[in-house]
Regions:
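Non-catalytic propeptide/linker segments at domain boundaries
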Residues: 1-48, 53-60, 249, 254-262, ...
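Aromatic-Pro/Gly-enriched surface loop or interdomain linker
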Residues: 82-90, 98-99, 621-751, 755-758, ...
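Active-site-adjacent mobile loop/cap segments within catalytic or ligand-binding domains
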Residues: 147, 230-233, 239-240, 251, ...
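A short beta-strand element within beta-rich, extracytoplasmic domains
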Residues: 162-186
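Pro/Thr/Ser/Gly-rich low-complexity, intrinsically disordered linker/stalk tracts
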Residues: 518-561, 611-631
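Beta-strand-rich modules
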Residues: 591-611
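A glycine-rich, often tryptophan-bearing local segment used as a flexible ligand/cofactor-contacting loop or short
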Residues: 758-858, 868-869, 876-877, 907, ...
Length: 922
């Protein structure tokens, strides 16, 4: 067998591959991937997660709170929002032994409890087969309760009219991951048809039920509206599977939920059963007996050395009994918990969840990651000669950070880890691969990541060591595996990169590319194609009664193959979810028909043979139902807020660290990596531990999702414009597209609504984010000089740009004074007050980090300039000016806080009404 090969190979032996249907495939995806990871199965995880410390009898993290985070919060902020989506957009099926959905709410719909948080019902002929399935009979789990062993599943014939429907009771409107489960049988179908109905859209999936049963099988993330409605459900259609096969239905889960595993130290009691055993006792010969035998003529060498006597003996055994009582849960969303608890929830056999009778969770957590991987991959072509669930997983990757720092402030850098033998000392994988492959894989990964980061950030990213040693996470997996210790969470310099979303994206892309090439190398193939970067300069404008969408591809200077060859256009209407997209056949300009009176959003994905990019920022269009195109006025909404940034830094007077109260930063979509505010800034405390350590931080933000830049400013402004003035047309574009316009193209617009959000060129950005480029200033100036109104809102419109020289600073100040009729005076802090005043009302804003919206923590004090300008908003009743308005040569309003940060929906609508009444006066 391959197991006993002496040396192993560097690539999979010829003919060793998986060519069947993948575990999960999105059937409604409108394109094929030929040179990416389509149909390939990978396993990866991020660090450790929260675990129960049996000695201290408390839940804790493995690492301390440093620089506003801890390792287990930080590493997953690279993996879940960036790395896993990149791999999936390349076509890969990604398995992770930890919960991946940050949604803390949950709905579970199961055949055994058909009305629990939803409704399960069937049509056609179904039976309950022998064997076990999922059931949630208990609100919490202990070490004697395993949910995939307590229930049943259902079975129907393939090709029949049987149908199963899971309709959840969704707690709140939001995005939820959808997981299905089932039982595998000898005749299971390999292409079972699931349909997800989500907020007005329908997505189709094919699931291979010949593998990966009795666990949570991820389909995707979808928008669901609150409640139990017809448009929120999952269907299984048996008629689309071949006759002669069977399809299985078990539980469907919506959302990640919160941890259910209760932990405590078990009580141990002992019993002492007795049993009878037969023993052969020995009696050594004495001198008298020996003398007698010699006298009888025995030769000295022939005398028996001993005499054996058989007798019955009673033996008392000691048996330990472990009694598991009520414990405590982590109190956190499930995605923050360690693999040991997810494995318990996700169907790992009890004998593998804990090997120490629940006495040492830390060790169980280390082992369970690899055990769950091996159980899933066992019996596949890549892990033959074992019993498992036959998922053809080829590679494993783990992302961690570690400790260490340089006193001179240099970057500490990366470390890669591999192990060249398994738990039994074997140096060859069951597939026939040499375990030396993992060493080369780890070394290449570290080199690839360092090369990309060095090039993109103009630094020399250190490669500390390729460590080939005994680590559970790299020793136990039965496929090539590695750990990348990306950086040091103890090093302030490293953390200035780690907190930045751009760095997270680029790091994840470097890892994805290295995994892509490793997977192709193991199959002995040539060069793969790297998925493109997201497109830019997106616009949605009108041509008659049609919408014209335009965009520009982005060249990846590090990857020649990453150029797009086609594009996917996605759309949504009103409050519906995004559809599955249509191809544009290579065109970067498309014309689409829209229904009048409906708010549409569009976004674009760049595509090539290697997969699809991250989506572009969305743009909106609204066509008035009450005017002909030739007479309806049109508002142009420009998104000038594309900033992504880490938090504010403290670098002065012997102090070093991050100040979340000054600026929490701007994450991509959301941030769940913060534990709490930094408390120790003393640089002399470098390399110390605990509360005395430089960077020591609090835990008040642990488990919270903090909203960042969701690129939804255009949509919100469009919705308010539509609500206030449905007679207006609304079009929109990104700032890059706006900068490509000529001044003559502005004549078609009655108003420009410029959305600046938290755009700011500040020192802690890893790249500059100018509020107004020179081209934007020129266009806005020309528009105003023609007597057309401007509506501009943002927190840092006049704040001096950190990267600007003295000439540029003067130009910016002149633009603010001459075009926006205001002058920057100082910055106001909103830590204690989130209330503005203007237009005869109080205007509340989101001023603190939270899940609903990004916060406006500080903003400009802008005073009016010019005879026609006046202060229209203030920071308190009669306080500093928070915005201006003017009447000549055209009307305009500048708000020193983001309009979309107004937290009260009715106030926001009233403010927009008042603004339009003022700006669009005849």
């Amino acid at each position: 067998m391959l197991l006993f090969l002496a040396k192993g190979t560097d690539t999979y032996p010829e003919g060793l591959s998986y060519g069947g249907h993948p575990w999960v495939q999105r059937a409604s995806r409108p394109y094929a991937i030929t040179h990416g990871l389509d149909g390939r199965h990978l396993s990866l995880w991020a660090s450790h997660g929260r675990y129960y410390d049996n000695q201290k009898k408390e839940w804790r993290w493995q690492r301390p709170y440093l620089f506003c985070t801890t390792e287990d919060l930080l590493s997953q902020s690279f993996v879940y929002p960036f790395l896993i989506p990149m791999l999936e957009r390349a076509g890969a099926v990604v398995f992770t032994p930890r919960e991946r959905d940050s949604q803390s709410l949950e709905a579970i719909v199961d055949n055994d409890t058909p009305t629990y948080t939803g409704t399960y019902y069937e049509k056609g002929d179904w039976i309950t087969p022998e064997g076990k399935g999922f059931s949630l009979n208990y609100p919490a789990l202990c070490d004697t309760i395993f949910p995939f062993e307590t229930g049943t599943s259902r079975l129907a014939r393939g090709g029949s009219r049987a149908r199963a429907v899971w309709r959840p009771q969704i707690p709140e409107t939001g995005r939820y991951a959808v997981y299905v489960s089932y039982t595998t049988f000898p005749a299971s179908a390999d292409n079972v048809h699931y349909v997800v109905h989500h907020a007005g859209q329908t997505s189709h999936f094919r699931v291979n039920q010949q593998m990966g049963d009795k666990t949570w099988v991820y389909l995707g993330h979808f928008l669901f509206h609150a409640g139990q409605t017809e448009e929120n459900c999952v269907e299984l259609l048996a008629e689309d599977s071949p006759s002669g096969t069977v399809v299985s239905a078990d539980c469907v889960r919506f959302g990640g939920g919160r941890g259910r595993v209760e932990r405590s130290n078990p009580d141990v009691c002992y019993t002492y059963p007795q049993r009878m055993v037969q023993r052969m006792d020995t009696v050594t010969t004495d001198s008298l007996w020996r003398s007698k035998l010699l006298a009888d003529g025995w030769h000295p060498d022939s005398i028996p050395p001993r005499i054996c006597v058989q007798r019955d003996t009673i033996v008392t055994d000691t048996l330990a009994h472990y009694l598991y009582g009520k414990g405590i849960t982590s109190g956190l969303p499930r995605y923050l918990e360690g693999a040991r608890y997810y494995a318990h929830w996700a169907g790992l056999p009890d004998s593998l969840v804990t090997r120490d009778h629940g006495l040492v969770d830390y060790n169980d957590d280390l082992r369970s990651r690899s055990y769950l991987l091996n159980v899933m991959a066992g019996g596949s072509p890549f892990v033959p000669d074992t019993v498992g669930r036959r998922v053809p997983i080829e590679l494993q990757f783990a992302l961690h950070t570690d400790a260490g720092c340089h006193r001179n402030g240099d970057i500490y850098g990366s470390l890669a880890i591999a192990t060249d033998y398994d738990d039994y000392g074997h140096t060859v994988y069951r597939s026939g691969l040499s375990r030396k492959v993992s060493e080369r894989y780890a070394g290449k990964m570290m080199n690839d990541v360092a090369a990309d980061l060095s090039s993109l950030y103009h630094v020399k990213w250190p490669q500390r060591e390729l460590r080939v040693k005994n680590y559970s996470e790299t020793r136990s997996p039965q496929v090539p595996s590695m750990i990348l210790e990306l950086l040091s969470h103890q090093s302030y310099r490293d953390m200035t990169f780690a907190h930045d979303p751009n760095f997270k994206f680029h790091t994840a892309r470097a890892i994805y590319k290295s995994l892509l090439r490793q997977a192709w190398h193991l199959q002995g193939k040539g060069e793969p194609v790297v998925q493109p970067l997201p497109v830019e300069a997106v616009s949605a404008t009108l041509r008659g009664d049609k919408v014209v969408l335009r965009w520009s591809p982005v060249r990846d200077e590090l990857e020649d193959s990453a150029w797009p060859t086609d594009y996917v256009l996605y759309s949504r209407q009103g409050d519906s979810d995004w559809d599955d997209g249509i191809l544009t056949h290579g065109s970067t300009e498309v014309e689409v028909h829209v229904e009048r009176g409906v708010h549409y959003q569009f976004r674009i994905g760049a595509l090539n043979a290697g997969g699809e990019s991250f989506p572009s920022e969305p743009v909106s269009v609204y066509l008035s139902p009450t005017h002909r195109v030739s007479t309806a006025s049109t508002v142009l909404v420009v998104n000038g807020f594309d900033r992504l940034s880490g938090p504010a830094r403290v670098e002065s007077c012997g102090r070093l660290g991050f100040d979340l109260s000054a600026d929490v930063g701007v994450s991509y979509d959301y941030n769940d990596s913060f534990s709490g505010a930094q408390q120790n800034f003393q640089i002399t405390a470098m390399r110390q531990e605990g509360v005395k350590a430089l960077g020591y931080s609090g835990a008040e933000l642990t488990g919270l999702l903090l909203a960042g830049n969701r690129f939804d400013g255009i949509a919100l402004h469009t919705e308010e414009l539509k609500g206030v003035r449905p007679d207006l047309n609304v079009v929109s574009m990104s700032r890059a597209a706006f900068d490509h316009l000529s001044s003559s193209e502005l004549h078609r617009y009655a108003l420009i609504d410029y959305v600046a959000g938290l755009q700011a060129d500040v020192p802690h950005n890893l790249q500059p984010y100018t509020v107004f480029t020179e081209k934007s200033q020129a266009l806005l100036r020309a528009f105003a000089l023609e007597g057309r109104p401007l509506f501009v809102s943002g927190a840092h419109l006049g704040c001096p740009a950190a990267s600007a020289d003295s000439i540029r600073l003067v130009m910016n100040a002149n633009f603010m004074a001459e075009t926006l009729h205001c002058a920057y005076r100082a910055e106001a802090d909103h830590t204690f007050s989130g209330m503005f005043y203007g237009m005869g009302m109080e205007i509340p804003i989101y001023n603190r980090p939270g899940e609903l919206h990004y916060p406006c923590q500080r903003s400009d004090i802008l005073e009016p300039v010019g005879a026609s300008a006046f202060s229209a908003f203030s920071y308190s009743q009669g306080g500093f000016s928070a915005g201006v308005a003017w009447t000549a040569p055209a009307r305009g309003i500048v708000m020193a806080f983001p309009f979309d940060c107004i937290s009260d929906a009715s106030v926001r609508r009233t403010v927009m009404q008042a603004a339009l009444d003022f700006l669009l006066q005849p």
